[in-house]
UniProtKB/Swiss-Prot annotation:
Gene3D superfamilies linked: Aconitase, domain 3 (3.30.499.10)
EC number: 4.2.1.33
Quaternary structure annotation from Swiss-Prot or TrEMBL: Heterodimer of LeuC and LeuD.
Function: Catalyzes the isomerization between 2-isopropylmalate and 3-isopropylmalate, via the formation of 2-isopropylmaleate.
The keyword 4Fe-4S is assigned to this record: yes
Positions of [4Fe-4S] cluster binding: 347, 407, 410
Pathway entry: Amino-acid biosynthesis; L-leucine biosynthesis; L-leucine from 3-methyl-2-oxobutanoate: step 2/4
Protein name: 3-isopropylmalate dehydratase large subunit
Catalytic activity from the UniProt record: (2R,3S)-3-isopropylmalate = (2S)-2-isopropylmalate
InterPro entries associated with the record: 3-IsopropMal_deHydase_lsu, Acnase/IPM_dHydase_lsu_aba_1/3, Acoase/IPM_deHydtase_lsu_aba, Aconitase_4Fe-4S_BS, Aconitase_4Fe-4S_dom, IPM_dehydratase_rel_enz, IPMI_cat
Length: 466
């Protein structure tokens, strides 16, 4: 019987396996940030250990940083301490750090791919659930906890059991204006926010192949939002074109040898999956979440469902609770719902293509009165590229705020957050209660839809913008 891509990646990294024991996997890349790593480095120090392979570990500051200044003191004492600890730890243990003054600094899941740290066939871990992003390259990438971070730092290995497998086959071709964000929200709508629990999900089909690498990263980034352990897209010519000549990508003959191997990284025709889900991309409209998990989502032209429409009592109760928190009523259209803030950024949607899509909507328009709209590029290179293309001027002329790189309003861990009762159109990945600030109400959308909401002052269908 053939193997799935996940099984090939997993089996290639088993360094020790014994009966009744969880296999030990080799880890190719370890990404680190300031929030989940301090205790791990303290553990190394307490036991007199070193980082086993510091050249395979990369660190950045992203979660706690201010997006308005490079001052390390800007986001309070806790943030300052965490960033200072990261600087101290990286210097002591010989780990490459992209700090606030480094031109490549940015969100960990943005800088890894753009520097070529992430390659097909690798195992990638980080103390962050959205490590699944890197599965877009045909790499096995997943988030880990702080004790596991210490283990990887010390040994470059990690115990990891085998997951179940799921294939999501996206047939057909998406309509103009439909993005990877809409596609993945539609998938989560179909299978639910727990539909992928215990599985590694491989995304396949013509609509997936048509996505750019940045679109595939958005897709895999939100695999975790369907409960999956990781997301995968098999590498192809699109992958290789993105990676070639990047800093940490192979060069010369090594590149050609690597591509020959990467071409083998696909599921065999006779591979069997524990679950298979099929959707037609032509059926997908722009998506907007209405509730407090990413599975509570509808097309922008649909009405908000009634809790009574859910047959499952758990889903029914969840919907009722979500509507109360979001201050919404069943039967209304989201295009009638006004907003207070717009956030364009996060590890889901802060890359150059995302900013281009948002700028195309913002060009020649103005942010609606009473709306605060911020644009936060995912890294220094993304910011520089956007400014070279004049995107910053488009946003500024339209009344958007143009910020420095960081995680920003994705999570209420820095100065960018919602006040109680504020409603936000956000390109991030989570809409849980309080995710963007206590009492804040988050609606997940694509960058173009976020920009449209900013100029309309309410949710708007980008297909109908004049």
């Amino acid at each position: 019987m053939g193997k799935s891509l996940y099984q090939k990646l997993y089996d290639a990294h088993v360094v020790y396996e014994a009966e009744n024991e969880t296999p030990l996997l080799y880890i190719d890349r370890h990404l680190v940030h300031e929030v989940t790593s301090p205790q791990a480095f303290d553990g190394l120090r307490a036991h007199g250990r070193t980082v086993r392979q510091p050249g395979k570990t990369f660190a950045t500051m992203d979660h706690n940083v201010s997006t308005q200044t490079k001052d390390i003191n800007a986001c309070g004492d806790m943030a300052r301490i965490q960033m200072q600890e990261l600087m101290k730890n990286c210097a002591e243990f010989g780990v490459q750090l992209y700090d606030l003054n480094h031109p490549y600094q940015g969100i960990v899941h943005v800088i890894g791919p753009e520097q070529g740290m992430i390659l097909p066939g690798m195992t990638i871990v980080c103390g962050d659930s959205h490590t699944a992003t890197h599965g877009a390259f045909g790499a096995l990438a997943f988030g880990i906890g702080t004790s596991e971070i210490e283990h990887v730092l010390a040994t470059q290995t990690l115990k990891q059991g085998r997951a179940k497998t799921m294939k999501v086959d996206m047939t057909g071709h998406a309509s103009p204006g439909i993005t990877a964000k809409d596609i993945v929200l539609a998938i989560i709508s179909k299978i639910g926010s727990a539909g992928g629990t215990g599985h590694v999900v491989e995304f396949s089909g013509s609509a997936i192949r048509a996505l750019s690498m940045e679109g595939r990263m958005t897709l895999c980034n939100m695999a975790i939002e369907m409960g999956a352990k990781a997301g995968l897209v098999a590498p192809d010519d699109t992958t290789y074109a993105y990676l070639q000549n990047r800093q940490f990508a192979p060069k010369g003959d090594d590149w050609h040898q690597a591509v020959m191997y990467w071409d083998t990284l696909k599921s065999d025709d006779d591979a069997r999956f524990d679950k298979v889900v099929t959707l037609d991309a032509q059926d997908i409209a722009p998506q907007v979440t209405w509730g407090t998990n990413p599975g509570q989502v509808i097309a922008v032209n649909q009405v908000i469902p009634s809790p009574e429409s859910f047959s499952d009592p758990v889903e029914r109760n969840s919907a009722a609770k979500a509507l109360a928190y979001m201050d919404l009523q069943p039967g209304i259209r989201l295009t009638d719902v006004t907003i207070d803030k717009v956030f364009i950024g996060s590890c889901t949607n802060s890359r150059i293509e995302d900013l281009r899509a948002a700028a195309a909507v913002a060009r020649g328009r103005r942010v609606a009165a009473g709306v605060q709209a911020i644009v936060v590029p995912g890294s220094g290179p993304v910011k520089a590229q956007a400014e070279a293309e004049g995107l910053d001027r488009i946003f500024l002329d339209a009344g958007f705020e143009w910020r420095l790189p960081g995680c920003s309003m994705c999570l209420a861990m820095n100065n960018d957050s919602l006040n109680p009762g504020e409603r936000c159109a956000s390109t991030s990945n989570r809409n849980f209660e309080g995710r963007q600030g206590r009492g804040g109400r988050t609606h997940l959308v694509s960058p173009a839809m976020a920009a449209a909401a900013a100029v309309a002052g309410r949710f708007a269908d980008i297909r109908e913008l004049n």
